[in-house]
Amino acid sequence: MATKKKALKKSKLRHAEYYDFQKIQDKLYAESMDGKMFTKLVEIITLPENIKLAYRNIKKNKGSKTAGTDGKTIQHLEKLSEEKLVVLVQRKFSWYVPQSVRRVEIPKDNGKTRPLGIPTIMDRLVQQCVLQVLEPICEAKFHDHSYGFRPNRSQQHAISQVHKNMQLSHLHYVVDIDIKGFFDNVSHGKLLKQLWTLGICDKKLISIISAMLKAEVAGIGFPEKGTPQGGIISPLLSNIVLNELDWWLASQWENIPTQYPFKQTPNRNGSPNHGNKYASLRRSGLKEITCVRYADDFKIFTSSYPNAVKLFHATKDWLKERLGLDISCLLYTSPSPRD
C-alpha cells in the first residue's frame, strides 16, 4: 500500500512538470512563505495547464469510475477534446453552482458505517483544480507536526515521530484525543475565516469554496456545517481547520522564546534542526510537550501525568472555544501500570 501511495505521488509530480505547472506551484509556495495575500487565485485556477493537470490526476484515481448523482464518470469527460474540456471547466468557474452530492455508507471494522459524500465527476474536477493551487499556499503555513493527507508525508512518518518522542525525548505520557464527529461538525464560517488568515483573500474563490461546503446532499438536504468525507478538497480543508490547533500546541512549549543561547543548524535536507533550541528550552525548566497529528487523530506527548491532565483540559477547552468541537473520548498512556 505504501509503495502504491509513493508511486501516485511521483506520478502527480511528473504530471505537474509535464504541464509546466510545477513552477507556478513552487512560486505560490515561496510567496506564501513570504506572507503574500493572494487576491486573484481564480485566474490561476482556470489556467488551461491547471485544468489539464487536474483532469490527468482525476483520471488516474480509481474513484474516477464512481458515478455521482448525475450518473456520469470519467468516461463521459474522456469523450471531450482538451479544448472543450478546458472551456467547460472555465465556464463552470464563472458562476459555480455544485450539483448534489451522492451519499453512501462505508462499513467500518467496528460494525458501524462511515458516511461518504461523492460529488459528480465535474465537481470533482473543479475541486481538483482548486486543490492544486491552494495546496502549495497552505503547505507553506502548515505545521511540521501534521502528517495526514499532505505531500511527501505518510503514516510511516507519523509513527516514526511518535517513536522519537517516546524513546529519544522520553515523553512517555500521551494524551490521545478523539474529536467527536470532526468532519460533520466543522464550522463553515470559521473555516472560511481561516482560509483568509492563511492569505487566501480571493473573494470569488472563498465564495466557490463556500458553495462546495453547502452543496446539497441527495436525500438529506443542504448542510449547515461539516466537510463531507469523499470530496477531493475535504482533506485539505480539514488540515486548514486543525492547523490552528497545531500552532497553539506549539506555542505551549517549542515556540516559547528561551533566554539560553543556542546555535541554529540545518538538517541535511535544508530544513531547520530544532535540537539545539529544544535543549535550550529544557534548561529553562518549562514542561516539555509536543504533538503528532494525522488528520483528526492527534496525540500530545509530555513527561508527567499531572501535566498530561492539565494538557487534556486545556486542549478540550481550546477546541470548544476556538473551533466549536467536542471530544468524544480520551486515553492517557504512561510508562507503567502504576502511573
Which positions does each model-derived feature cover?
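Non-catalytic, polymerase-adjacent accessory regions of viral genome-replication enzymes
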Residues: 1-83
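Short alpha-helical scaffolding segments that buttress acidic/His motifs in well-ordered protein cores
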Residues: 54-55, 129, 208-213
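Amphipathic alpha-helical blocks
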Residues: 76-98
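Conserved polymerase palm-domain catalytic core
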Residues: 93, 100, 141-145, 149-150, ...
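Residues forming anionic-ligand binding surfaces in small-molecule and nucleic-acid pockets
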Residues: 107-110
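Duplex nucleic acid-engaging cores and interfaces of nucleic-acid transaction enzymes
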Residues: 121-131, 139-142, 173
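Active/ligand-binding-proximal structured segments within catalytic/core domains
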Residues: 126-134, 237-241
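Conserved small/polar residues in nucleotide/adenosyl-binding loops
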Residues: 332-339
